[in-house]
């Protein structure tokens, strides 16, 4: 959403600054561009052109948070729990630095990845400490994404 806002909802600009940077064949880049066009339409129709998130993004965070809590409660998901507790100090540190104590943990993780991508796009230097945190958060989110895929495919069994 912020990339769209930064490009003033201009698809030509989004193609130049975002889509063309993907190392993908032209047909995939065209799909990515179409996805951005659809996001622009959603942002306009939902009135979040200046700030805020479209409902789709809010729903994804809600679904991921629900899954996250179920995974933490499940005795079958010790690896997930360990990954979360390994990531937690970075989440706490990020919240303290950003003043985002009220944000859900997963939103803090996504904000960290977003901030990292923005720094990279701006060509700014990234400290080793930040890289360590981003690597751990990325690893944790990758595990959550895999569990989400399993859950959506009916393959995740969390009986307690």
Predicted regions and their residues:
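Short, well-structured alpha-helical interface segments that form or flank functional binding sites
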Residues: 9-13, 31-34, 59, 82, ...
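N-terminal interaction modules that seed assembly of large macromolecular complexes
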Residues: 1-50
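Charged low-complexity stretches with an acidic bias
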Residues: 45-66, 150-160
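Glycine-rich, aromatic-bearing surface loops/beta-hairpins
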Residues: 92-160
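A charged, amphipathic interaction segment
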Residues: 54-113
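Secondary-structure edge/capping motif, primarily at the C-terminal ends of alpha-helices
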Residues: 7, 18, 46, 71, ...
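Non-transmembrane, amphipathic alpha-helical segments
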Residues: 24-31, 45-56, 101, 105, ...
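Charge-rich, solvent-exposed alpha-helical interaction surfaces
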Residues: 35-38, 42, 63, 67, ...
């Amino acid at each position: 959403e912020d990339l769209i806002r930064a490009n003033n909802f201009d698809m030509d600009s989004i193609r130049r600054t975002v889509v063309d940077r993907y190392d993908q064949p032209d047909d995939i880049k065209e799909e990515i561009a179409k996805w951005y066009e659809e996001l622009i339409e959603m942002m306009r129709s939902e009135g979040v052109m200046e700030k805020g998130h479209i409902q789709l993004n809010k729903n994804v965070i809600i679904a991921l948070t629900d899954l996250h809590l179920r995974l933490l409660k499940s005795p079958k998901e010790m690896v997930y729990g360990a990954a979360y507790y390994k990531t937690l100090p970075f989440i706490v540190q990020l919240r303290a630095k950003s003043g985002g104590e009220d944000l859900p943990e997963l939103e803090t993780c996504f904000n960290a990845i977003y901030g990292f991508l923005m720094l990279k796009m701006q060509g700014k230097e990234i400290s080793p400490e930040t890289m360590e945190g981003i690597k751990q958060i990325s690893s944790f989110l990758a595990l959550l994404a895999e569990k989400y895929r399993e859950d959506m495919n009916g393959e995740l069994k969390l009986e307690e």
